Amino acid sequence: MKELLLYMAKNLVDNPDAVSVNEITDEEGKVLELRVAPEDMGKVIGRQGRIAKEIRTIIKTVAQRDGEKVTVEIVD
């Protein structure tokens, strides 16, 4: 999941070197924290949060297929 999220985020932003994903495992599953450069935040979130919602949907769908629970948090 982490690699998929990195791939998607790096292809959306102008500064792909600033993209990082931190994976945290807790009792409810995995949390992927996505960090991007401040100037790229709008590109990852999108108009009315549409891109962020689609990123979360894709990751959640792939995780469910693999029997996992994964959530994505976009942090600044």
What do the predicted segments below correspond to?
Residues M1-K43, K53-D76:
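RNA-contacting regions in translation and RNA-metabolism proteins
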